[in-house]
Amino acid sequence: MDKISLPPAEGVTQSAARAHARGGGRGRNPRGEGERLRDDILSVTLQLLNELADDQALSLRAVARAVGIAATSVYIHFADRDALVLAALERSHRDLMRSLDEAEASTDDPVGQLRARLLFLGQWVQQHAGLYKVLHESTLNQRTHMAFKEELGERTTAAIRRCMAAGRAPDDDAAAVSLDLRAAVHGAVSMRVNQPDLPWPPLEEQIDRFLVKLVGVAPVPAGRPSRERTTPKPT
């Protein structure tokens, strides 16, 4: 699979990453920079969640120490750990959606657009396995309805509808096909995260099979270049 250039953790600013790396102190923010401090807290939280892969293992004290502020300063912006984690995940999700849209824009072919979205998601999970687990496998995910995640399914359904409208896939219930496809793709990437030592085939080969068997697109003849085989442009 072609490598896609992604940041070390989605939504982590360079200043926050440096603060996390050195664990040093931080001067008082000038007046009017409360939003900047909030962004730094979210960035460090995303980095720590990606490392820990567990929202329950995150402490606000650790976040404050990494940012270089007093723990009480975190509470100015977030009522508790759940509120902080939810805000961080929502920002990460928003950044991911923007990157998926950019990947889709790399081709005008509707099947290529759908494939590009799925491949980018797979690459993102590889580089953000901890965040993926918190988003989909954490106790917070079980206890809380993360409404922002619904957008990912809606965008996938819209991409499938475009394939059907262009005659590239059989006319069907796009929402049902989307659910089947998302279940298959999330299963493939989740199993790679949780069972990395299994002899996995290249993810793009699995995705191509999903597109043929679940969406109904035409398979790519061996040896023939295809518009579907479009690699998302770097972000």
What are these regions (language model features)?
Residues M1-R36, P221-T235:
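N-terminal intrinsically disordered/low-complexity leader segments
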Residues D2-R18, D172-N194, P202-K213:
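Hydrophobic alpha-helical segments that form the core
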Residues L37-T45, V63, A88-S92, L96, ...:
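Generic hydrophobic, amphipathic alpha-helix propensity
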Residues D40, L48-A83, A87:
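Helix-turn-helix
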Residues V85-S92, L135, L152:
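Alpha-helical DNA-contacting segments of helix-turn-helix folds
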Residues D101-G130, L181, R224, E228-T230:
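Hydrophobic alpha-helical connector segments
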Residues Q126-A158, N194-D197:
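Short secondary-structure transition hinges
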Residues N141-A166, A175-L179, E205-V212:
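Amphipathic alpha-helical packing segments from all-alpha helical-bundle domains
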